[in-house]
Structure formats: structure tokens, C-alpha cells
Amino acid sequence: MRAKPASPKSDPEDPGLRTFTLAGHLLAAPKAAPGLYLVATPIGNLGDITLRALETLAGVDIIACEDTRITRRLTERFSITGLLKPYHEHNAALARPKILERLAQGASIALVSDAGTPLISDRGFKLV
């Protein structure tokens, strides 16, 4: 039996609950508090991601990512359907003010790179 896909929208019965799947099981992820979350992603094997990273990605309002195609593979594998926004060296100057504005409005945003931890050899350092 396959787990039902996750939804980035709040459950009408519990507005603070979001979900993701792991090994075919549907798991709960609380809605993330407002703020910027730096989330490390696996280098090579998607199965190496941490439970905390999955909870964070499922719980945030926006996932700012280096390459949406790469991050989409990760989010689809774990049934995380959230709003992916590109944030990389070619659009950082334009995207950064928008992200900062959303943060000021109370959004929760995860910053991820294609592999590894944001800020290590990428443009994330200017946002943080």
C-alpha cells in the first residue's frame, strides 16, 4: 500500500500539520515557525537525508533552492509538495530582496543547495 501524497497546505482539521512520506509511511511535520532554515541535502544518495531535514522541508512555506529540478527530485521522492523558488548565483541579486521581504512578513523558508550544506561554496552566504 502506497502512502498518500503530502500536501503543502494546512490540513483543515489541524492547520499546523503537514506531511511527508518515508519508506511508504505517511509522517507528520509541524508547520515551521517563521524564519530562515538552512537545510543540508544528501551528497549522492537521497536516502542519506535526515528526518529533521524532511520535517523542515515539509513544514516550511517556501524552499529556496539552487536548482529546482534537482530539489524537485528530492521533494518528490518524499512526497513533499511545497513551493520551490530558485535561488542561485545568476538570480541571487533579484531573488534575495524578495526572500527577505517574505521573511519579514512571517514566512518560513528553507535554503538548500543541490548537495551538501548551504553556504559551503555557494551563494547562500549573502542571504544569511
For each predicted feature, which ranges?
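Catalytic-core regions built around general acid/base machinery
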Residues: 53-59, 102, 126-128
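Conserved helicase ATPase core of P-loop NTP-dependent helicases/translocases
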Residues: 94-100
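Short helix-loop hinge/linker segments at domain boundaries
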Residues: 75, 101-104
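Glycine-rich, flexible N-terminal cofactor/catalytic loop recognition
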Residues: 8-90
